[in-house]
Amino acid sequence: SIGIISSNYFSNPSSKLKLIGITGTNGKTTIATLLYNLYNTAGLKAGLISTVINYIDGKEIGSTQTTPDSLTINKLLHQMVKEGIQYCFMEVSSHGIEQRRISGLEFAGGIFSNLTHDHLDYHNSFDQYRDVKKDFFDNLPNTAFSLVNKDDKNGKYMVQNTKSKIFTYGLKTYADYKIKILESSLEGMLLKINESEFWSNLSGKFNAYNLLAIFSTATILGMPFSETLQLMSMLKNVKGRFEYLRLNNITAIVDYAHTPDALKNIINSINEIKTNKESLITIIGCGGDRDKSKRPVMGDIASSLSSKVIFTSDNPRNESPETIIQDMVSGVKPLNSVKTISIANRKEAIKTACQLAKSNDIILIAGKGHEKFQEINNKKHLFDDYKVVKECLTKMN
C-alpha cells in the first residue's frame, strides 16, 4: 500500500521515535495536544499531529484534516526524527484508519477515549464505525501498549484481539488508573489521583477523563508520578475546547462540541458547576452536507438542558441554513419550544445572546471551536466565535 511505500521511502521514521495514536469520538485533540504540551514543558523533545495544528518541538506547521495522508505523515515523522524528537502524539481518525492513511506506521501505543454517534454519514452504521476504530488496536504490535476508557462499554471491544499490553482508566469502574473530582468550577477542578490532590485549569467531567488518559500515558511511558502531577497542574485548555472568557459579569464558553454526546457533556458540565441563579444560553448549529440524523438529537439536547437556545448556522456548506435549523427544531419537545429562537446569521445569534444575557449568565457557543472560517456555498468566510463574542461583550459597556 501507499502507506508502506511512504514509510520505506522515508526509511520508516515511525520506528525511530515513540509514536502514540489517540482515537475515539471526543477528546482526541485535547489528549494529543496536552500530552504534547506536557512533554514539551518537561523539556523532552515531542511532536504533535492533530486537527488543529501540527508541532515539531515548539514549531508550528498548519493542519486541516485529523489524519493527514500517509505521505504527509511520514514526511512529518521523518522531519521529527531528523530533529531528534523522541515522542510524537497523533490524532487517529476513523477516516484515516479506513483509508489506510496510517498503514505502515509503527505505533508504540494507542489510546481509546470513547465512542459515540459521529461521522455516520461516512461510515453508514455505528458497528462499521466501531469496527474501523478496533482495527487500529488489532494492528498494534506486541511491543506497544493500549490504554482504554473502561467506563465506555466499547473499550473492552476495542482491545479484544490486540497483541499489545492492555491498560485501563476510568472514573466509575475499577480500572488500572483512576481519578476523583473533589471540587469543580468554571475556572478548573481539584482532582485526586492515587492519594495525591492537584488543581487543574481544565473544567468538566469529560476533561477529568482526558486528564486521566494523559496521566496514564505519561506513567506508562515512564514519567515519575510527582513530575507528572506537577506538569499536569500547569496545563491550559486547548484553543476552542471549553475556552472560557469573562467580560462585564457575563461568561462565554466557546467549544468544538459538534456531536450529540460532546454537546451533552459540555452542557451537563456547565450545569453541574453553575448555581440555579444563572441562565445558560446555548448557541448551536449543525454542519451542512453531513450526517442529518444527529440534527434533531442535538436540537433536543440543547433545548432540554439549557435555559435558552438560539439555533443558528454552523458550516452550512451547500445546504440552506434554514433547512438545517428546521431539522434541529424538529427534535425539540413541545414543552421546550418556548426556550428556543432561530437566527440563521451566526454573528447576529451571538449578538442576540449577549443582549439577552443578564449579570452572571453563561453563554455557550458550540460547534466550531477553534475554526477560523465559516463555509457557506463553497466559500470560506472569516469567522471566529471567540473573537465575535469578545467583541460583543466588550461593546456592552
Each PLM stretch: what is its role?
Residues 2, 98-100, 120-121, 156-157, ...:
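Glycine/Thr-rich phosphate-binding loops of Rossmann-like dinucleotide-binding domains
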Residues 2-150, 154-163, 212, 218, ...:
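Phosphate-binding loop of NTP-binding sites
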Residues 46, 87-88, 166, 280, ...:
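Hydrophobic anchor at the start of a short beta-strand
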Residues 47, 167, 177, 196, ...:
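Structural signal for short hydrophobic segments within the conserved structured cores
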Residues 94-97, 153, 173-175, 236-237, ...:
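Short acidic loop-to-helix transition motifs that present clustered carboxylates
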Residues 123-130, 134, 160-264:
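Adenine nucleotide phosphate-binding catalytic loops in nucleotide-utilizing enzymes
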Residues 213-226, 230-240, 244-397:
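ATP-dependent carboxylate-amine ligase
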